[in-house]
Amino acid sequence: MIIIDEISLVSHSLFQKVNKRLNEIFEVSDKSGVYFGNIPVLLFGDLAQCEPVAAKQVFWRAPGETFSLWSDLFRPINFNINMRQGEDRHFFDILCRMRLGMSLLDFNND
Protein backbone atom coordinates (compact mmCIF):
# COMPACT_ATOMS: atom_id res chain seq x y z
CA MET A 1 0.00 0.00 0.00
CA ILE A 2 1.17 3.50 -0.81
CA ILE A 3 0.17 6.27 1.59
CA ILE A 4 0.41 9.89 0.50
CA ASP A 5 -0.08 12.46 3.24
CA GLU A 6 -0.64 16.20 2.67
CA ILE A 7 -2.21 15.48 -0.72
CA SER A 8 -3.09 19.18 -1.05
CA LEU A 9 0.61 19.84 -1.74
CA VAL A 10 0.78 17.30 -4.58
CA SER A 11 0.26 18.86 -7.99
CA HIS A 12 -1.85 17.43 -10.78
CA SER A 13 1.25 16.74 -12.88
CA LEU A 14 3.16 15.09 -10.00
CA PHE A 15 0.17 12.82 -9.32
CA GLN A 16 0.17 11.82 -13.00
CA LYS A 17 3.92 11.14 -12.84
CA VAL A 18 3.58 8.98 -9.71
CA ASN A 19 0.98 6.87 -11.53
CA LYS A 20 3.14 6.58 -14.64
CA ARG A 21 6.30 5.69 -12.70
CA LEU A 22 4.56 3.02 -10.60
CA ASN A 23 3.14 1.51 -13.78
CA GLU A 24 6.68 1.43 -15.21
CA ILE A 25 8.16 -0.14 -12.06
CA PHE A 26 5.51 -2.86 -11.90
CA GLU A 27 5.45 -3.28 -15.69
CA VAL A 28 1.83 -2.29 -16.18
CA SER A 29 0.75 -0.82 -19.50
CA ASP A 30 -0.78 2.65 -19.35
CA LYS A 31 -3.53 1.30 -21.63
CA SER A 32 -4.40 -1.66 -19.39
CA GLY A 33 -6.88 0.17 -17.17
CA VAL A 34 -4.63 -0.48 -14.17
CA TYR A 35 -3.33 2.50 -12.22
CA PHE A 36 -0.52 3.12 -9.74
CA GLY A 37 1.07 -0.21 -10.62
CA ASN A 38 -1.99 -2.01 -9.24
CA ILE A 39 -0.89 -0.98 -5.74
CA PRO A 40 -3.59 0.30 -3.33
CA VAL A 41 -3.18 4.05 -2.71
CA LEU A 42 -4.45 5.88 0.37
CA LEU A 43 -4.50 9.69 0.36
CA PHE A 44 -4.73 12.02 3.35
CA GLY A 45 -4.95 15.76 3.61
CA ASP A 46 -7.01 18.89 3.90
CA LEU A 47 -7.71 20.31 0.45
CA ALA A 48 -8.46 23.70 1.99
CA GLN A 49 -4.85 24.01 3.12
CA CYS A 50 -1.76 24.99 1.11
CA GLU A 51 -1.84 24.44 -2.62
CA PRO A 52 1.11 23.18 -4.65
CA VAL A 53 3.59 25.94 -5.47
CA ALA A 54 3.17 27.27 -9.03
CA ALA A 55 1.15 24.24 -10.15
CA LYS A 56 -2.42 23.03 -10.57
CA GLN A 57 -4.04 21.23 -7.65
CA VAL A 58 -4.28 17.44 -7.71
CA PHE A 59 -8.02 17.53 -8.43
CA TRP A 60 -7.70 19.95 -11.38
CA ARG A 61 -9.11 18.57 -14.60
CA ALA A 62 -7.52 19.67 -17.86
CA PRO A 63 -9.91 20.89 -20.57
CA GLY A 64 -10.93 17.91 -22.68
CA GLU A 65 -9.59 15.40 -20.17
CA THR A 66 -11.97 12.44 -20.25
CA PHE A 67 -10.45 10.55 -17.33
CA SER A 68 -9.19 11.93 -14.03
CA LEU A 69 -7.02 9.91 -11.66
CA TRP A 70 -8.43 12.01 -8.84
CA SER A 71 -12.17 12.02 -9.45
CA ASP A 72 -12.51 8.69 -11.24
CA LEU A 73 -10.40 6.55 -8.89
CA PHE A 74 -10.69 8.09 -5.43
CA ARG A 75 -13.64 8.57 -3.10
CA PRO A 76 -13.31 11.23 -0.40
CA ILE A 77 -14.19 10.50 3.19
CA ASN A 78 -14.76 13.65 5.22
CA PHE A 79 -14.06 13.82 8.91
CA ASN A 80 -16.35 16.32 10.61
CA ILE A 81 -15.21 16.13 14.22
CA ASN A 82 -12.02 17.90 15.21
CA MET A 83 -10.35 15.68 17.78
CA ARG A 84 -7.36 17.96 18.42
CA GLN A 85 -9.05 21.19 19.50
CA GLY A 86 -12.39 19.76 20.59
CA GLU A 87 -12.10 21.13 24.13
CA ASP A 88 -11.14 24.69 23.19
CA ARG A 89 -14.04 25.95 21.08
CA HIS A 90 -12.62 29.47 20.69
CA PHE A 91 -9.28 28.20 19.36
CA PHE A 92 -11.14 25.73 17.12
CA ASP A 93 -13.24 28.56 15.61
CA ILE A 94 -10.12 30.65 14.96
CA LEU A 95 -8.40 27.72 13.21
CA CYS A 96 -11.49 27.07 11.07
CA ARG A 97 -11.61 30.69 9.95
CA MET A 98 -7.89 30.67 9.12
CA ARG A 99 -8.25 27.39 7.19
CA LEU A 100 -10.91 28.96 4.98
CA GLY A 101 -8.99 32.22 4.53
CA MET A 102 -11.55 34.24 6.50
CA SER A 103 -10.66 37.44 8.29
CA LEU A 104 -9.92 37.32 12.00
CA LEU A 105 -10.40 41.07 12.40
CA ASP A 106 -14.15 40.82 12.92
CA PHE A 107 -13.92 37.61 14.95
CA ASN A 108 -15.88 37.75 18.20
CA ASN A 109 -13.48 37.21 21.11
CA ASP A 110 -16.19 36.40 23.63
Language model features with spans:
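Conserved ATP-binding/catalytic motifs of P-loop helicase motor domains
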Residues: 1-110
